[in-house]
Amino acid sequence: MDKDIGSAVAELQVCSTHYAMTIVSCGFHSPQSLMNADLQHCLLADQNYLLNNSNKNKGSIIEENTRKPFQSARNLQTSLKTHPESAITRYGLGYAGFGNGWTALKPKILFPSQKRRVKGRFTFPFSRRSNLAQSKLPVDLVPIRLEIDADRYKLRDSFTWNLYDKCISLDQFAEQICIDYDIPLHNVHIVQNISKSIQAQINDYEPRKAQSNLSFVSDVSSSTSETVYAHEPSDSLAKASKQQIPTVQNDLRILIKLDITIGRLNLIDQFEWNLFAPESSAEEFATVMCLDLGLSGEFCTAVAHSIREQCQMYIKYLSLIGYLFDGSEIEDEEVRSYILPPLKNTLRFSDMESSSFAPMIYELNDAEMERQDRGYDREARRMRRRQGRAKHGIMLPDLRDIPKIHRSLFPSSSVPSDDDFMHALSLSTNSDGETLNEINTNNPEREHLIVRLKVDSQKLKIIVEQSQTLTLNNFQQRKLTPLPNSMSFDSLNEFESERNTPSTYGQNISPLPQFSSPSLSSDAFLTNSNSSESALVHMQKLNLPDFTPSWVKRCVIETFAKFPNDRFNVIVKPALNPAERMTVRICCHDCINEYFTAGPGFTFGNFHIHLLSSSHQQKKEVRMNTVLDRNT
């Protein structure tokens, strides 16, 4: 647009010049003096008009330039929504998502029948007719606790089961549990134990079943604030008589105690709960509580299960002793001591301590988790052996034993655990007196990041030589005597040359010496002062072949210096292929027929783990005691 205005101004100037030349050609002697003032005024007015018009059009030009990319972006977004396959042609195959599925799709409802099936698993189909029939039945949740110990499997779980569930049988549910926990289905006894345990707990819930069909109907009366029970018809009680139950007072409070451990978190709390409050819902209370405390959904289900389980204990106890739930006084002294007295005031300050009724969350370490796990197993066995108090031939539940909930998270195959095996292995090779199984896994997080760099071969050799020099200096700081020239630590180039030398397999190799039981006088017990000298002596006694790599000699000396009372032999077998690494194995004299391959890397770390094991320590003590008895 600016170019058009400039060209128009230039044309006006050309026109004015042409007009002036025309006047000159007509015979006028001074064109500028003869220029008409009106013509100049018109030319200036036209020029100002064009300039003002250009300033007004700048805003429209900017708006037009902004609208074009915005409109193209909107068109691209619309095309991606309507035709997702066009994203592949525009952005490449990476936009398809591969295992994550398609992106930028319209949201849609995914029904269970449309879910992607996991390989090797199956689900039980539910028809619409069965779902419609199930929706018309009432919901009565039974707290279920599984404690299954079979073969090498230990299953502990807690959940709620709908008493009127008609969609799936207990056997099918038990099979689905085994599938979810990767328990092979050929273990039929585990499936049977799960279904029998659930069925037994449902049968124990029968006394509560009659009371679960009672609902509260408020008596709209200004004179009384009492509540009336009304009987609701259901499938199971359709033939029962619909007799009216007398009015009762809605105040039967108990003390709920929570002790829930999930993973590393332990929740401890206690609060009062009314057994027959019409607005009390264990699930809603657990949801609000976990939201306030910032806990996960696993705690939500555990809190609701614990509330229902403890309420069921009191309901079962009262039903078995013949209590009619008619608001009368409870005659049994034991259960009366657990029932809280009626409330007289809404606010209480004197009879209630806020510290004892406040939730507490503890984070457990590995030792505390293991100790709590053992205590939970011991308590579970004790509760199975213990029988409740019998009264009139009826076994009553023990209200003193409040069941705890202890859930250990199921290990995931995709999410790695916190333990690093290589880190534990490095700790085991550097620790004195700890085996690989005894390493404390509660180590602080490492602040270093492993970065892989591309280094030249020459630079890599220099780096390796420098690291070997550092190891040599650290080794000499242990007050070891200097090694002979024949046993000096060579560089990595020497090891490469030794590895590339032709194989000497089949040639005359010096036989390995046969060691007998060391006597007391022949350094059976070494002290720190002569440990370096004895390491060299043992090194010479091994009589290693000439083609033994230098790192093997170094590891032998380090092992003898670190474990002076242990006896072992090193077997070096050359490789048939010169490009391969020769085989180095270590034979322990105390443990018969036990051979260990050198490693990891150019170390004897695997053999050091064996020397630190308790079984080897016991055999070594037996040998040393035998030597002592023989010399005395």
Curated annotation (Swiss-Prot):
The keyword Transcription regulation appears for this protein: yes
Keyword field contains Transcription regulation: yes
Molecular function GO labels: transcription coregulator activity
GO CC entries: chromatin; nuclear chromosome; nucleus; RSC-type complex; SWI/SNF complex
Domain of life: Eukaryota
Keywords tagged on the record: Chromatin regulator, Nucleus, Transcription, Transcription regulation
GO biological process, any: transcription initiation-coupled chromatin remodeling
Compartments (UniProt record): Nucleus
One Pfam family of this chain: SNF5
Quaternary assembly: Component of the SWI/SNF global transcription activator complex composed of at least arp9, arp42, snf5, snf22, snf30, sbf59, sol1, ssr1, ssr2, ssr3, ssr4 and tfg3.
Family that this chain belongs to: Belongs to the SNF5 family.
Function: Component of the SWI/SNF complex, an ATP-dependent chromatin remodeling complex, required for the positive and negative regulation of gene expression of a large number of genes. It changes chromatin structure by altering DNA-histone contacts within a nucleosome, leading eventually to a change in nucleosome position, thus facilitating or repressing binding of gene-specific transcription factors.
UniProt name for this protein: SWI/SNF chromatin-remodeling complex subunit snf5
The organism of origin for this protein: Schizosaccharomyces pombe (strain 972 / ATCC 24843)
Record lineage: Eukaryota, Fungi, Dikarya, Ascomycota, Taphrinomycotina
